UniProtKB/Swiss-Prot annotation:
Domain BRCT: 608-688
Function of the molecule: DNA ligase that catalyzes the formation of phosphodiester linkages between 5'-phosphoryl and 3'-hydroxyl groups in double-stranded DNA using NAD as a coenzyme and as the energy source for the reaction. It is essential for DNA replication and repair of damaged DNA.
Catalytic activity: NAD(+) + (deoxyribonucleotide)n-3'-hydroxyl + 5'-phospho-(deoxyribonucleotide)m = (deoxyribonucleotide)n+m + AMP + beta-nicotinamide D-nucleotide
Gene coding for it: ligA
Taxonomic superkingdom: Bacteria
An annotated GO BP: DNA repair
Presence of keyword Ubl conjugation: no
PROSITE patterns attached to this UniProt entry: BRCT, DNA_LIGASE_N1, DNA_LIGASE_N2
Residues that bind Zn(2+): C423, C426, C441, C447
Name of the protein described by the UniProt record: DNA ligase
Keyword line: DNA damage, DNA repair, DNA replication, Ligase, Magnesium, Manganese, Metal-binding, NAD, Zinc
Record EC number: 6.5.1.2
Molecular function per GO: DNA binding; DNA ligase (NAD+) activity; metal ion binding
Leader peptide range in chain numbering: none
Length: 688
């Protein structure tokens, strides 16, 4: 397992420290490149690498040929034939802070003599994305694809030709008039997020191990010894560089190279630009950062390359990287820290969630001190204990989570987590149903923690939209026992609000105005605001549309609720239990008392027309050859069928297209008839 500077005491002997760093970095490289089982966060690796570089800079006599600083890193796996690259596949130096980019631009400008003029002449750079995948080289001879190899250690890689041949985005024959005799295309094999999710759905359906992330999935798929397995994996490719070129002149700029690649039929990413100077580089970086989470694939930074080929040649290379390029990496999304305690939080519905209390660590652009552990089963599965050194992940707006513990660093006094039997907030008992992963406090609205969360949910924009009722105000209202249920909100007055801490008179009046406005809502919003487990906005709208008014919903049996579009057994039972609880009915009556919350009510939705599928439940999954899912749904409903969202024993038919996933496996397990699109059409025509 991984060891870092934290597990090896600092020493005054640079030689000893350098030797340990080299061994640790090589071990991490082997785990990452050969085993495809990375166990050291990128940020930790970068920190160790920079420390070794610093030691070798101060003590040049300690540099040895096999130091990680003198090569790219990694070894060819024994299961594939080695391929020696005619031109090395080098890695890039990294920059992290804006200052690093300004310094890079200055170094380039100085070396090219552009900073000597007055005013300085800005350097043109090609800026593009840094994909989180696997680097490969494709060789084409007279336009025909003949070989593919991984980067390996930069000098020798692995022959993965047959596997790469299965990647549909990679042309087996180049097109266009300008096809060279020999061309080595450098690029990245990756897996799009949507394809990764579908792959894991298939893995789950087949009861096989799921992949941790798209990069691991891409790497594992590319290095399959059986290319038939690779062919079933949804891999993609983007070209971004060049190795050997024979039979024509090298394009004058990097941007022209990528334009030429597009002419040849090679996939080139469109998120690229030619920019000038450090200001242009940073503008591109921050622009990409704003839309990073919305991109359909994972990236871990951007890459800058001097655009002109002659200037690249003039700048040349250092031992392991080109001087004309730099990778500008986003803040690390994973980091190491110590787990000092595990507490539990109580959610709006009483869910008890273990929360890791951490030594502060900077990850994903923010300092993290808490991270979710999801539930008791996850803590057990990952074998996470108090006192462990853990890997923490934070990406974008996602809640930080503990990924795993480093078992080789576990202290002797590490303690296992014990789920409490009583709620830490109200003292009520904690229960966990046999078929659920979540334990829950049974205190209901008696529990202040649930009370606060329930009020916060009630006030959300998509619920009753009570502007100005934030968490701090709710905390005071609950802690001072001024509000116990949502109905109490409409009883508070100006004097009460004005006395709250840091709550000005204007704020008090604004909140009262917002409460008055919230009294006029819709049935769907009101249902959603109640915070019924498993009832989101869509289900609330379906309930309102189906029943037309609140009383029929409150009195509906589970069987009646199952007739609502997309309501399955679990949701129906949750709704039924909520309205069966007398306390909930009391709160609802208080809310719709005269002068309180009102909404327009109407008749229930008309019964589905009788047809050949009247009374039948059908589930759609996958992609149909000629029909969009909504079209198929409309056809089935027009024939009287209920189109459900999940497969159960009550499902009469499953209509399955391509990439059917777990619903198909569930249907086969339950013996539900499975139809393709043609079968569905025959069913609609009454031929089945």
């Amino acid at each position: 397992m991984a060891r870092t500077s934290a597990s090896h005491p600092a020493t005054s002997a640079p030689a000893e420290r350098a030797a340990w760093l080299r061994a640790e970095l090589e071990r991490a490289n082997y785990a990452y490149y050969v085993l495809d089982q990375p166990d050291l966060p990128d940020a930790e690796y970068d920190k160790l690498f920079k420390e070794l570089e610093s030691i070798e800079t101060e003590h040049p006599d300690l540099i040895v040929p096999d130091s990680p600083t003198q090569r790219v890193g990694g070894e060819a796996a024994s299961g594939f034939e080695p391929v020696v690259h005619d031109q090395p596949m080098l890695s890039l130096n990294n920059g992290f802070a804006d200052e690093d980019i300004v310094a890079f631009d200055k170094r380039v400008g100085d070396a090219l003599g552009k900073n000597a003029s007055e005013p300085p002449v800005p350097v043109d750079y090609a800026a593009e994305l840094k994909f989180d995948g696997l680097a490969i080289s494709l060789r084409y001879v007279d336009g025909a694809f003949v070989q593919a190899s991984t980067r390996g250690d930069g000098t020798t890689g692995e022959n993965v030709t047959e596997n790469v041949r299965t990647i549909r985005s990679i042309p087996l024959k180049l097109k266009g008039k300008r096809v060279p005799h020999v061309l080595d295309v450098r690029g990245e094999v990756l897996m799009f997020k949507r394809d990764f999710e579908r792959l894991n759905e298939r893995q789950r359906a087949a009861e096989q191990k799921e992949f941790a992330n798209p990069r691991n999935a891409a790497a594992g798929s590319l290095r399959q010894l059986d290319s038939k397995i690779t062919a079933q994996r949804p891999l993609s490719f983007f070209a971004y560089g060049i190795g050997v070129l024979e039979g024509m002149e090298m394009p004058a700029t990097h941007s022209e190279l990528l334009d030429w690649y597009k002419e040849l039929g090679l996939p080139v990413n469109s998120e690229r630009a030619v920019v000038q100077g450090a200001e242009g580089l940073l503008g591109f970086f921050h622009g990409v950062g704003e839309k990073r989470e919305k991109l359909p694939y994972d990236i871990d930074g951007v890459v800058y390359k001097v655009n002109r080929r002659d200037e690249q040649d003039a700048l040349g290379f250092v031992s392991r990287a080109p001087r004309f390029a730099l990778a500008h990496k986003f803040p690390a999304q994973e980091a190491l820290t110590k787990l000092v305690a595990i507490d539990v939080q109580v959610g709006r519905t009483g869910a008890i969630t273990p929360v890791a209390r951490l030594e502060p660590v900077f990850v994903g652009g923010a300092t993290v001190t808490n991270a979710t552990l999801h539930n008791e089963d996850e803590v057990r599965r990952k074998d996470i204990r108090i006192g462990d050194t853990v890997i923490v992940r934070r990406a974008g707006d996602v809640i930080p989570e503990v990924v795993s513990a480093l078992l080789d660093r576990r202290p002797s006094d590490a303690r296992e987590f014990v789920m409490p039997t009583q709620c830490p907030v109200c003292g009520s008992s904690i229960e966990r149903l046999p078929d659920e992963a979540i334990a829950r406090c049974t205190g209901g609205l008696f529990c202040p923690a649930q009370r606060k969360q329930a009020l916060w949910h009630f006030a959300q924009r998509r619920a009753l939209d009570i502007d100005g009722l934030g968490e701090k105000i709710i905390d005071q209202l609950v802690e001072q026992n001024l509000v116990r249920t949502p109905a109490d909100l409409f009883n508070i007055g100006f004097a009460t609000l004005a006395e709250l801490d840091r709550f000005a008179e204007k704020s008090a009046q604004n909140l009262l105005d917002s409460l008055e406005k919230a009294k006029h809502t819709t049935l769907a919003r009101f249902i959603y605001a109640l915070g019924i487990r498993h009832v989101g906005e869509s289900t609330a709208k379906d309930l309102a549309k189906h029943f037309g008014s609140l009383d029929p919903i409150m009195d509906a049996s589970v069987e009646a609720l199952l007739e609502v579009n997309d309501v399955g057994p679990v949701v129906a039972e949750s709704i039924h239990q909520f309205f069966a609880e007398e306390h909930n009915r009391t709160v609802i009556e208080q809310l719709r008392a005269p002068g309180k919350v009102t909404w327009p009510e109407g008749p229930p939705a008309p019964k589905a027309p009788q047809g050949v599928l009247a009374g039948k439940t059908v589930v759609l999954t996958g992609t149909l050859p000629s029909l969009a899912r909504e079209e198929a749904k409309e056809m089935l409903e027009a024939a009287g069928a209920k189109v459900a969202g999940s497969v159960s024993k009550k499902t009469d038919y499953l209509v399955a297209g391509a990439d059917a996933g777990s619903k198909l496996a569930k249907a086969e397990e339950l013996g539900v008839p499975v139809l393709d699109e043609d079968g569905m059409r025959k069913l609609l025509e009454g031929q089945l």
